Amino acid sequence: MDWLLATPQLQSVFSSLGSLVGGTYVVSPNALAILEEINHKLTYEDQTLRTFRRAIGFGQNVRVDLIPLLENAKDDAVLESVIRILVNLTVPVECLFSVDLMYRTEVGRHTIFELNKLLYNSKEAFTDPKSTKSVVEYMKHILESDPKLSPHKCDQINNCLLLLRNILHIPETHAHFLMPRLQPGSGHQVSMQNTILWNLFIQSIDKLLLYLMTCPQRSLWGVTMVQLIALIYKDQHVSTLQKLLNLWFEASLSESSDDNESNTTPPKQASGDSSPMLTSDPTSDSSDNGSGGKKESCEERRQALREGTDATLHEVSRKGHEYQNAMASSNAANYILEGPCSAQQPWSDCEMQEYKQMTAVISEPLNLSQPADNVNYTTNANYARTTSTDILTKTTSLKHEGFKPPAPRRNTLSAILSDNYAPLSFISAVKLGQKSPHAGQLQLIKGKCCPQKRECPSSQSEHSDCGYGTQMENPESISTSSNDDDGPQGKPQHQKPPCSSKHRSKQRIFAVPQDTKDLRRKKLVKRSKSSLINMKGLVLHTPNDDDISNLLKEFTVDFLLKGYNYLVEELHSQLLSNAKMPIDTSHFFWLVTFFLKFAAQLELDMEHIDTILTFDVLSFLTYEGVSLCEQLELNARQEGADLRPYLRRMHLVVTAIREFLQAIEAYNKVTHLSEDDRYRLRQLQLQISATTDLRCLFVLLLRRFNPSIHSKQYLQDLVVTNHILLLILDNAAKLEGGQTIGLSEHISQFATLEVMHYYGILLEDFSNNGEYVNDCIFTMMHHIGGDLDQVGVLYQPIILKAYSRIWEADYDICDDWSDLIEYVIHKFLNTPPKSPMAIPTASLTELTKEQNQEHTACPWSQEDMDSLCWYFVQSKRQNDVIGNIAKLFSNNGNKIKTRISIIQQLLQQDIITLLEYDDLMKFEDAEYQRTLLATPTSLTTDSGIELKESAYGKPSDDVQVLLDLIRKENKSQHLVWLQKLLLECCYVKMMIKCGSCQTDVEPIMEPVVYHCMFKQKPIPVVQWNNEQSSTMLYQPFMLLLHKLGIQLPADAGLIFARIPDFWTPETMYGLAKKLGPLDKLTLKFDPRDLEDAPPSRHHTGARNSLSSISSLEADFGDSEGLALIPEVDPAVEKAAAAASAIPNNEIFALPRVKHCNSIIRYTPDPTPPVPSWLQLVMRTKCSKRRSPATDASDCTSTSTMIADDEIKSYASMAQASHTKLNSGYPTSTLVCMNKLSNCSFAAPPNENSSSSGCGGTASSMSMPNMPDGNSDALMKTSFERLAVTGARYLRPSNTDQDYSALVASVYENEFANSDNVSVASDLTRMYVSDEDEKHELQLQQVE
């Protein structure tokens, strides 16, 4: 507690800021310097104990010193400094340090308690209206001072918004506090949050926010604005706001019938209106927005909104001062502001009688001097105190009407909303039977709501629609789903499904009688022209939850009409562009989820949501869904990780997509849309139907559903959203230009035991689900059990039990679902049970039955598998490696391991390559050798692909062997899946290079690939369904991915494999062609654009982790200009590599070992196979010292000398790298590989030359246009390589002993780095390939 010793000095510093003189607070002349000192100490305080701010809290300096200074300071610099200090003091505790760590100690818990107390006292201090008034007025002053805001002034506005955000974010520890100042002796409890919100809205924070959303500098505070709006709606349920809107419309209908008789005079036009009230045709269905038949553009409306807001900012400031003066003279009973009513019609008799009864009602004429559709509203009020509480009782039964004559009917909602529209601050809640919250003199400008009630498809819990930031104790309640009052909570009514053969679920009906629609639209017009709104004028009125809900109901309408589309657009653009400054995406998801349902309910014109209902937004939501699914699963694997943020974001993504799709359905039924709007909706649906990632996303999310961490509400939202998407896909196929979608094939991905089990979990609670949710479940089960004839996946206890309960309870469901239940139960009872199958442990390559049986007979325990690698290292020096490993197992008391099972286990643990496996197996198993002999070796494989006469065109190529093996095992569909992904990456890369926008491109770009390419991130190979997931467990396919240069999940420590983002379109197109023919695939681009492109001079294909160059050679195209590069002296190359090893530590861009997670394997980045400039120079010098080979004997002697020199240098380098460079790299072989990798280019093989490419004729040796002739020697890996010469197989006599010693030393070095064993073993195989090719070369030359 040493920091308390500084408290007297601290109190002296704060007391020097100012003092009260005769009841007036006088600011000290040195206040600015003192504030700067305080801010400096706050910035550099103890980062753990936070002693300085704790001392401030202990001394109550926020309430005693800073708030009075904020309220009375006139100097802008002082105000700026005070606000900056208050922002710093109100930062949440969790942003200061790790709360979990601090809770573990007594000192930490005490620190947290004191900081929370400081925050609570700060929030309590801001319940004074003067404190928030000072902040709001300061922002208005900045905006009025200069239309062109400087960056410094923008920072000042952002600090004000941050302060309001921090204050509203502070939790109320005691939930409520007493306000004896407002209610003496009553003891009525009032929420601090409600009080602050009430004060802010009276001080016209709503108008200010709407202006800031549309000003040119909105990008500087867009994120803060979203956070502030989210906190304003905290703990507000969507269902509550929807009910208020619907109740208001229902109450308005009862008032319209009386007006229809006598209201015949058309309303007068406001001075700022630019269009008449009536269209040329009252029943016109056009979308004219009242601008002389010309639809304003987005920028025009935005500019007009800013101009209209600027015109009223001075008025807002003036009214604010009037409000503050009225607070000082609160002894007056009430104030009535008189003024001309030129834009108003006379009141009705009923209204006049009601007005006479309301002695505390204040009204003010509407300021209509602004352009139509550009008027904002204010809520500047002069408080008035009444002496009679009876007024409250009387005003609760009053009804309000704006003016007597209704406007003639217009069918275009856009014209209704644009004609002299200005958002509401607050509509009298008395007609809803609630207390009107406002007190005092108000300037209120009208707003509109759409009369039609929107039916929501799901019936869910009341806690499902909390505003952003609500924390519920029950995890099942944490959701943002739709309403709980739009579906039956008890027994659903009997309802027949539609007759559609594909989707027979209940269709939502929006049918409203036409006369009811007309009455509602008349009421909207009447409200749009209304200028007098009667409000209860009690300064002592304390707001409750209902008052705040009514207040936010009106702000919701204003926000949707004036700022929603701008704010979403701004946040979306920042999420795509601000890669360096991460933004919490949950704000964006919440904006779409929370407000889009209101836009559909009000049937707002499309121009108000033109930036939300776009394919760009839906594409981003799809990409985020995949990304969050991977992040959630990764964090779920980490013990003790906090999954709540990921669960929250994941749920918000699903609900945002649901609201997006529901809005499309709702607007498809709106009758007053223009042709342009309908065309945009059709195009959006066609884009959705063409997007594979979106529909596959729900297959992925349902498969990855985890009942232990996910809530049932999340599962329900998944099922409902997927159902809505299927309906849209079905309808999109019927549109003009729609593509035929294989829905049956898509639905078959859901026909798994796993997914149907989750449907059964949701069906268990059928009595509480609601009719629509049950329809979604039964529809999917009907398709799977009926159309797909896979009723077997429904034979699960949880599903059958639910069926039995529904059947026994005589639950009233439609006939089709009853038939489904009866069919499944009958089929299950009459299906004979099958004997349990013994699932064999198949070998990785599934080649012969004998191998499988032998492998099954030799089970491997975890201890055996762990010992295998060590035994392999020990036995590497032996001639019979496999026999020695079997002997070691037998000597250590283990069961006898067969030789074949040891070889298979070596391959399974990635200790040997597939080609090494082939070499070992063909000497162990005669049948396996016969299978290899049957492999086609001609220039045309069994797949019909013509292979070029090059290194990678030979069947012995690693990639070609894997491709042949995958095709032989009837797994070609996996290659097609990879081909499609590579072609999509190629297409997106080409479009991004052309600068095309995602919306403008036809055909569309898949969301996941597009956003990864746009953000320059590797593209994930997402396994959408079970079949693709099993593919990633298939060892040959995984080896193929690695050979192609695709980063495996284990290499990156992620769930999905990754395609490098730096690959060029030519590279990706070449890989796709290598995997198989492209004739049957639909290409989105013209392949001639890539084939005619200039060849790349650098290699961007496969990585050097499994082979020195890998099977993907750099395609140099016209390589006649490249001369042959002779071999370099290994000693010289070794010295050059050693000299550059230290400064080039980051050559592989790998993190150091101490920063690596033990579960992550790392693979070095691809490096070009072309020698570096130093290698070129050294090899050129060597070529001058050596005479060129003139005949076969010279070539043989030269190659033999080079091979012997390299073998000796390799052995010495392996030891040097282990002792000197092991600490700098994850494995010593990485450095060793950097030194050893050299490329020798020779002529290609021909009729007169051997397969090695060295002993060719003079003509073949003089051909420089085939640089890949000897590169195949760098890829082939084997212990004892068979050289293919025609159809005859030759076996080398023996293996060099020096080489064996080298391999053993390398394995010993790798075993010391256990986390990277697989990478080290892969690199060692490159040396095997390199050395064996040189021995093969010598052998063939001798023969």
From Swiss-Prot:
The UniProt record lists the keyword Signal: no
Biological processes annotated in GO: DNA repair; DNA replication checkpoint signaling; entrainment of circadian clock; replication fork arrest; rhythmic process
Main location: nucleus
GO CC terms: perinuclear region of cytoplasm; replication fork protection complex
Chain intervals with Low complexity compositional bias: 273-288, 489-498, 1249-1262
Region (Disordered): 256-314, 453-512, 1247-1270
Region (Necessary for normal circadian rhythm): 238-270
UniProt subcellular location: Nucleus; Cytoplasm, Perinuclear region
Record keywords, A-Z: Biological rhythms, Cytoplasm, Nucleus, Phosphoprotein, Repeat
Skewed-composition ranges (Basic and acidic residues): 293-314
Record PTM text: Phosphorylated with a circadian rhythmicity.
Single GO MF annotation: DNA binding
Record-linked InterPro entries: Timeless, TIMELESS_C, Timeless_N
Motif Nuclear localization signal: where in chain: 517-527
Biological role stated in the UniProt entry: Required for the production of circadian rhythms. The biological cycle depends on the rhythmic formation and nuclear localization of the TIM-PER complex. Light induces the degradation of TIM, which promotes elimination of PER. Nuclear activity of the heterodimer coordinatively regulates PER and TIM transcription through a negative feedback loop. Behaves as a negative element in circadian transcriptional loop. Does not appear to bind DNA, suggesting indirect transcriptional inhibition.
Quaternary structure and interacting proteins, as annotated: Forms a heterodimer with period (PER); the complex then translocates into the nucleus.
Family: Belongs to the timeless family.
Protein name (database record): Protein timeless
